[in-house]
Regions:
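Noncatalytic modules at the cell exterior or secretory-pathway interfaces
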Residues: 2-12
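Glycan-processing catalytic domains of CAZymes
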Residues: 13-15, 19-22, 28-268
Length: 268
């Protein structure tokens, strides 16, 4: 039977025999706008190309635009856009997809370590921009768990009871989430903070994540260590591979990163 519930003046109505259950409510204002069609270039399917996205441009959540406005040569193509708006994300999707980019990897920073997660930190670009965008079916997304600066679970129970369910409900279950061979793609930045906490037990937690996503119909997860210096031992912590976060002056040089890491160890 159709059921209607009212919570804080908001009406929720099911269809058929679907049961209504609520654990959190997010309300966004929907503003209609015209959007140009996305034209995927020929040959774009020959490779899978992804791009790290570091969403730092919403005033009040991070440094905002004041950091770069003095430098006109790095002014964005979109101008100083309002991050976290669907229309902004639609233009980003259009520009990226039409230049052969298949998915965006968004940084995800936790707020809580030992309690249910209500909202991540600095995630407006994904939650309020990309996910409601009209063109999101033209591009996939995945998460980079930013464990270097965001909150990390206090123990395995917190990881399994708070972090994993949150990712599954809000992201992995989304049809736009990036998969390879029906496995969700999931990266970790700042894995050292997790390794220092869990040790080789980190592998058991990642294996738990792989099993949990099967409940959503996936065949597991591909978990990547986002670093440019740890080339051995990643598998013992549960990683399937590793990659460099950036391709700047040092990020693109494997030998340079290894040398810098060895020097840092010697200095310490």
């Amino acid at each position: 039977l159709t059921q209607t519930d009212f919570v804080n003046g908001i009406r929720f109505e099911n269809t058929g025999d679907t049961k209504i259950s609520l654990d959190d409510i997010r309300v966004n204002q929907l503003v209609d706008y015209e959007m140009e069609a996305v034209t995927i270039p020929e040959g774009a399917e020959d490779y899978i190309v992804g791009m790290n996205v570091c969403s730092l441009w919403r005033n009040g959540e991070h440094t905002g635009w004041a950091t770069i406005t003095p430098y006109e040569d790095i002014r964005p193509v979109l101008g100083y856009y309002d991050e976290g708006q669907p229309q902004t994300s639609d233009w980003e999707i259009k520009f990226l997809a039409e230049h052969g980019v298949d998915f965006q990897a968004f940084c995800w920073l936790g707020r809580e370590s030992d309690k249910p997660i209500k909202q991540a930190w600095d995630i407006t670009a994904l939650d309020n921009g990309f996910l409601p965008a009209k063109n999101k079916d033209k591009m996939k997304f995945c998460l980079i768990w930013e464990a270097a600066n965001g909150a990390t679970p206090v123990d395995r129970d917190a990881f399994r009871n708070y972090f994993v369910p949150y990712w599954m409900e809000y992201y992995f279950s989304n049809p736009s989430y990036m998969t390879i061979e029906n496995k969700v793609v999931f990266a970790v930045f700042g894995a050292d903070s997790l390794i220092s906490k869990f040790g080789t037990g980190l592998k058991a937690e990642f294996d738990y994540l792989r099993e949990e996503v099967k409940k959503l119909g996936f065949d597991g997860a591909i978990i990547l260590d986002c670093n440019s210096y740890r080339t051995e031992g990643s598998a013992s912590y549960g990683f399937d591979g590793w990659y460099a976060y950036n391709w700047g002056q040092q990020g693109c040089y494997y030998e340079a990163n290894v040398t810098l890491n060895l020097k840092a160890k010697e200095d310490n």
